[in-house]
């Protein structure tokens, strides 16, 4: 029977990030395929089939072929228990992605070989660098036309400001793609796929050494010569591999492959598991000390809440990242924010919308806790006499705003419940005019597609039709002043500025332009504004 330390050190918990359509969900499913968690991978946008991506569980995700919520996927591979946090790639869902990255110990960055680093990748990468977690790069779609690999490496280093080390090297691309050269093993893995096995089985990979005469026949003489030149150049000029730099997020190992055809996925997975750390210590915000993952004391934090994963039961699940110790079904833990002990009667493992009861889980694991309405994003749970509280994370200021009311006033109860539950998940933020109720609310979102998702979910999950009116505001700022030192109603503001409050009564200001923000700051000397709200945990 494995010890507590052995169980925890076998865990690997990472997030997969990318720009939309770079192949993130496809790579996720191929990792599951190699891990034996699934037998057939779904086609994310397949029109010929009724299959859908395993990690895309919400109806709207299956219809649109995009990920709009974060999924948690767990499987075992070669003695390691792997937790994948599959994050939304769509640019309108970056806030959920941000919180999910707080639960990861490292990240895999998927890049489209034809496009290089894109806008969404930059934003998510910056979140990773704030935490100094290891970042691995998978350059995808090498079986299609792609940019020069040297150009791609330079692109990553210049735009993201991180050094790179290619773990393998591509041999041509597109229709002429022949495979990759494994720099560590000093051998060629030849690309071999008939194109009909995509998503159904694992492809064979043919091995051959550089300089072997058989390589001329396998990849062609011209490709063989070009590969030899490239490797000589890399060995002489490229950054040296430094595992310590990797684990501090200063050097990104780069792998080339094709997730759709399964090529390069298993070699990537093996190297990734070899190089990535076991669960990392987390800082206790109260004491400033690091919490040892292998401590006997259980601790964890809620980083996500999802309502209606099972529409038949109108449930709410709190996603908990275990930071130390061991979870046992039926255990009691201290809920820091509530100030009392609660019984954790049931924990569930999470494979998108499929759930199974778990009797135990360890630091590094993500479990789902049934939430009767007591949990919020950022809550800390712990055991032991010394309570811990994990550091806070900011909330992004929304950039799009709309006034929302229900069409049928008789469905006010369902409307309020739906709005509050969806807001508690963190996909939207809801506000109201100072001192008003929930007759009409102001919804703020990071991207406009979230408004469409809100309308869809209220109709589909709560049977509520809504009216939505766009508001002419683009910026939101939290007011940091204490209520007794500032009278919000008497601030000197422009006509396109609006004073509102969030659902906890915290005051905020909506602005129509940056000029209006400057006016407010210049004409109200004591006013303190912030671009970020704060969730403390």
Question: What kind of region is each of these model predictions?
Answer:
Residues 1-537:
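Structural and coupling elements of P-loop NTPases
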